[in-house]
Amino acid sequence: MGCGHGRVEGVSAKENCVCEILRDIVDAQNDVIENCCDTSCEQSINDLLGETDPGNGLDTVPVILYCAGDCKPFKGFGARRGNGLGTIGKLQSSFIFRVKSVTDDCCAVLELLRDPNDPCECDHLKDPCDQSTHNLENTGICITVDLDCFCHVTCLPAISVFD
């Protein structure tokens, strides 16, 4: 797992390591839902799979992505449907995501994760350190991204976002 792992020169040279890691996270999360370092992607995946504590109830590896080029943290935006058909709810933002799926061509569906007690104003989040991580929950707000646009992924410790 990770950048360059298992690659043979000339084979799969275009494989994106961010894409590869996120694909591994999706596989691990799907295994849990249907049934080194203290903090790393590998550790978070192992925790999620119960390799360190079986039956731990964890279901998500939260991730922060960094844009290629400027290497700045990526902030996603979205909104729930409003109360009536054809209406849009309040715009929300997050630097922290749950990976829902990754396609063969490295597009991913990401769900915004937020602490429901954290203010939802999009302007107050200037970088990931401004975002509360104490009680992250799934929002149901998903975005689609091209993983070739990212150069780095930070995995936070595995958590449970589903009851």
Predicted regions and their residues:
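Short glycine-rich, low-complexity segments
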Residues: M1-D163
